[in-house]
């Protein structure tokens, strides 16, 4: 072999060694330019909002852009409402806010402050089943129609709304607002004193069973107020909410058994075929929901919790417990949330409320079927309400109204992705195929101009834009247009915007 040929062979061998040694680096660098299959996979569609938990979606986005998926993500919260407050009631407020559920604290202190029978423990359960007229309906009619002091809230300090239970229930029913009714033997002021806390003897249980039966029979059989959702007590594990000391789980289990039995008897006997729902355990930051799923699942069909703070922390934990049982597809309600600490005059707190509504309308372990913010009105002069005792609407009333407009009523949802940690967004459509884009900004200092890509849902459309911030209380601020599916929006600090893009046939 010639020397030149030997030299060429040697150089070829050396070059091959260099290439093989560098191959892992070349492969790594090439991968940075070519997206993997996982990175190009589209997001999931058609996920049931009360389905099992979803795997996390890893999708990148530019910080000041929002990209909306064209595939349905889930459905929004079906029922968004409020708890009552004793100082006021005006159906026009509920309709303006856009709520479709109202949480009422019923029970003995409200409608049986004195035993309706002259003999404790009578009529018995068997006597009532034999003849419901064994109950003193004259006293029930009086309490529900002509309450003490002219107010169905006679059990609360003044000022009180002046009106009776008939008016309250009839107006809610006429407005098609779903009533969630708490059934409790004692209230948060530990009344009535004649009712044991908790019931223990046969006569105690006769009294409680009769009260539950009489409440529902009066509302739905003697009258037709369509009350079909019942909460078993209110925070029974909290000393300030009735029982002293707080109930044990065993005591609550027995209480739930008698409560459910009375509810079921009314519906099966007098309202056959009518759907009804029983909620439990109405606790906050507790392991009771997990235990109830194992101990008394036969006595309730709707998981019921209270969450004060970020929705995700309480809701995700309870969904995990539900997924481990046969309860995975049953509804989860948050029948109290928001604040009882006088925080509804803060724009930043209003943004946290909007964010919770968005979380609750997200699929998987964050999903909330129904919710009732605490509270719509003040209790007496205690500033817990979105509306004060004089009728003035606090700042966060308007945050709630904006969020409800976007999310109320089991609407199809579409994932709306942004890379900006201050922004949270979701998109929904209504029955008329109008598209709603809701964006919140939790930064107290930084406003943002964002670019929105809605091309997967719409190409061209005109819109109406509402804004909530320190200068705007859910007011219309513009009419953005969509061109080739694109638009730009300005999001104020500690603010939110909602854009409704109108569907054109």
What residue ranges belong to the model's regions?
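Solvent-exposed beta-hairpin/edge-strand motifs
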Residues: 455-474
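Catalytic-core region of carbohydrate-active enzymes that cleave or remodel glycosidic bonds
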Residues: 302, 306-381, 388-406, 442-444, ...
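Carbohydrate-binding surface patches
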Residues: 420-459, 497-498
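C-terminal beta-strand-rich structural cap/linker in extracellular carbohydrate-active enzymes
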Residues: 480-505
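Substrate-binding cleft and catalytic face of glycoside hydrolase catalytic domains
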Residues: 97-300, 304-313
């Amino acid at each position: 072999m010639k020397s030149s040929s030997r030299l060429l062979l040697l150089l070829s061998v050396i070059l091959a060694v260099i290439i093989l040694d560098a191959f892992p680096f070349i492969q790594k660098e090439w991968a940075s330019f070519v997206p993997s299959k996982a990175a190009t996979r589209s997001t999931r569609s058609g996920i049931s909002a009360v389905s099992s938990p979803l795997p996390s979606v890893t999708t990148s986005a530019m910080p000041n852009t929002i990209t909306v998926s064209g595939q349905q993500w889930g459905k929004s919260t079906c029922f968004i409402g409020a708890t009552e407050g004793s100082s006021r009631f005006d159906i026009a407020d509920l309709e303006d806010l856009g709520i479709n559920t109202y949480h009422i604290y019923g029970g003995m202190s409200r409608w049986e402050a004195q035993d309706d029978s002259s003999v404790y423990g009578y009529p018995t359960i068997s006597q009532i089943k034999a003849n419901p007229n064994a109950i003193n309906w004259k006293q029930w009619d009086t309490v529900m129609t002509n309450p003490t002091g002219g107010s169905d809230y006679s059990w609360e300090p003044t000022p009180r709304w002046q009106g009776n239970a008939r008016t309250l229930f009839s107006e809610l029913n006429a407005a098609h607002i779903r009533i969630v009714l708490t059934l409790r033997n004692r209230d948060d002021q530990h009344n009535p004193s004649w009712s044991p806390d908790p019931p223990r003897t046969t006569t105690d249980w006769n009294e409680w069973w009769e009260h539950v039966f009489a409440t529902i029979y009066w509302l739905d059989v003697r009258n037709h107020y369509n009350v079909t959702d019942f909460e078993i007590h209110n925070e029974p594990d909290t000393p300030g909410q009735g029982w002293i000391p707080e109930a044990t789980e065993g005591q609550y289990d027995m209480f739930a058994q008698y409560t459910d039995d009375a509810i079921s008897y009314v519906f099966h006997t007098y309202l056959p075929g009518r759907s009804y729902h029983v909620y439990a355990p109405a606790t906050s930051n507790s392991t009771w929901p997990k235990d109830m799923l194992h101990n008394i699942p036969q006595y309730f069909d709707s998981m019921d919790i209270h969450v004060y703070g970020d929705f995700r922390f309480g809701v995700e934990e309870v969904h995990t417990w539900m997924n481990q049982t046969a309860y995975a597809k049953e509804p989860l309600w948050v029948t109290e949330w928001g604040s009882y600490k006088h925080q509804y005059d803060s724009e930043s707190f209003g943004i946290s409320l909007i964010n919770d509504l968005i979380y609750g309308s997200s699929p998987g372990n964050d999903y909330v079927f129904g919710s009732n913010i605490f509270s719509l009105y003040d209790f007496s002069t205690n500033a817990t309400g979105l509306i004060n005792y004089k009728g003035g609407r606090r700042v966060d009333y308007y945050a709630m109204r904006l969020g409800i407009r976007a999310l109320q009523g089991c609407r199809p949802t579409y994932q709306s992705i942004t890379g900006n940690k201050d922004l949270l967004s979701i998109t929904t459509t209504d029955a008329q195929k109008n598209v709603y884009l809701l964006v919140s900004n939790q930064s107290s200092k930084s406003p943002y101009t964002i670019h929105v890509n809605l091309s997967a849902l719409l190409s061209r459309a005109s819109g109406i834009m509402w804004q909530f911030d320190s200068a705007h209380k859910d007011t219309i601020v513009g009419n953005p247009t969509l061109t080739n599916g694109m638009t730009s929006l300005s999001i104020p600090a500690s603010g939110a915007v909602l854009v409704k893009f109108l569907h054109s046939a």
